[in-house]
């Protein structure tokens, strides 16, 4: 049908929207490659004991750099050793905060993406969000010329606020402007742009490009470029016709927007679909967070939804994304940053592969397959690190295990939770459930970002045995508690949840979605 095609305006609009997703991915990955350079700068600015030459070796001090190095003139060897240890702990803490502050911002903002989109409209909300992206980029871009640790932590926090908003706004906008039969395919471009941003940040972070003493601050501030480009292009994008029709009740503007997006005057199907959606939505009330846990019809679905997101984050995947360079270094790889880029490339490739598999294999099946694969990869990852001193070839075992770990993650546990949470709930409770799921996802992201380095320091090469145990627990939970949602109506899914929880059917049925497929998770 004419309306179910990708027009020039639709392609332009989707490209513009996913520039926000690209920034999201760039901000996730950018902190990884220049880790050693930034840590050296932290030590240089904060002051390090003179016998710890690792912090200042080959560091080119220019007129703007004022070293605050403490001299050991009147200290005993024991006191000096304590001071050195204390300095190392402070630097480790500041680096962990530099990584995890991004998740704090995302955690705070994740609840407000939908609210901002309803308040300002989808286009204006994305424009407003970009002010946060530009502010964060400016703070980080200037970090070399001030208190670097404070500016980077502040900049990462503000960028996290932006990403928390955009993680809700972009999928929502794309889902609302896409034709029904293309909604799933276009919706996955959010995730694809995100992992592309991660890969580009890793390439730009190579030492001979921007990940060096001279340009690392430019690398951190470079997200301003797609932010400015998106601000410019958004001025030429049509507002969401669903927002105009369902929220503002402006049918004339909604029709005008639809005609631009569809490239045709015949928009009857879309208007009728929105009219039906409006009638159905009016019969079903919204649900609060408390009701999700107190109402027996929602309690088990929300618990399962949250557990899926916990499984995604506590699998250890973000430990790899945030700290992959140091992990490869520990594994004995001579050029760890190139291996990290390999992880980013595999991440992008298998995100695309998952799109082709999800409707054929089913959500639960792919999630289980991914978790089982990640369990074995985590075991071999740790075995490779533990036995590295005895067998140098074990470094290749660890590296291969990391690549496969990321592949299995993107096949199932990466994208699947977002599909399934949307399918567990009908129109009334769905916005609240998705907001709560996003919040829990960011909270777990923050915990891993903050704690992984400490856990890795404590457990050493055994760290991924811990994550293997966690993955095994979530795999068993998925096997016994998570239903398959592919091809099932909401009534069928709700009935299965009621059977598992032993609750009675609801006294009064509400209007539900007739069929739940991947193209309908908006």
From Swiss-Prot:
Post-translational modification: N-glycosylated; required for stability and retention at the cell surface of pancreatic beta cells.
Transmembrane segments annotated in the record for this chain: 11-31, 97-117, 126-146, 157-177, 186-206, 216-236, 302-322, 338-358, 366-386, 402-422, 432-452, 460-480
Expression sites by tissue: Present in liver, intestine, kidney and beta-pancreatic islet cells.
Gene Ontology cellular component annotations, sorted alphabetically: apical plasma membrane; basolateral plasma membrane; brush border; brush border membrane; cell-cell junction; cytoplasm; endosome; plasma membrane
Intrachain S-S bonds: none
Catalytic function, reaction form: D-glucose(out) = D-glucose(in); D-fructose(out) = D-fructose(in); L-dehydroascorbate(out) = L-dehydroascorbate(in); D-galactose(in) = D-galactose(out)
Regulation of its function: D-glucose and maltose competitively inhibit fructose transport. D-glucose, D-fructose and maltose inhibit deoxyglucose transport.
Coiled-coil annotated residue ranges, if any: none
Modified residues (Phosphothreonine): 521
Keywords: Cell membrane, Glycoprotein, Membrane, Phosphoprotein, Sugar transport, Transmembrane, Transmembrane helix, Transport
Pfam families cross-referenced by the UniProt entry: Sugar_tr
Annotated localization: Cell membrane
MF terms (GO), sorted A to Z: D-glucose transmembrane transporter activity; dehydroascorbic acid transmembrane transporter activity; fructose transmembrane transporter activity; galactose transmembrane transporter activity; insulin receptor binding
Family matches, as InterPro entries: Glc_transpt_2, GLUT, MFS_dom, MFS_sugar_transport-like, MFS_trans_sf, Sugar/inositol_transpt, Sugar_transporter_CS
Membrane topology: Multi-pass membrane protein
Biological process annotations from GO: carbohydrate utilization; cellular response to fatty acid; D-glucose import; D-glucose transmembrane transport; dehydroascorbic acid transport; fructose transmembrane transport; galactose transmembrane transport; positive regulation of insulin secretion involved in cellular response to glucose stimulus
Extracellular domain ranges by topology: 32-96, 147-156, 207-215, 323-337, 387-401, 453-459
Glycosylation site residues: 62
Ligand binding (D-glucose): 191, 312-313, 318, 347, 410, 418
Sequence similarity: Belongs to the major facilitator superfamily. Sugar transporter (TC 2.A.1.1) family. Glucose transporter subfamily.
NCBIfam families, A to Z: SP
Function: Facilitative hexose transporter that mediates the transport of glucose, fructose and galactose. Likely mediates the bidirectional transfer of glucose across the plasma membrane of hepatocytes and is responsible for uptake of glucose by the beta cells; may comprise part of the glucose-sensing mechanism of the beta cell. May also participate with the Na(+)/glucose cotransporter in the transcellular transport of glucose in the small intestine and kidney. Also able to mediate the transport of dehydroascorbate.
Protein name: Solute carrier family 2, facilitated glucose transporter member 2
Lineage: Eukaryota, Metazoa, Chordata, Craniata, Vertebrata
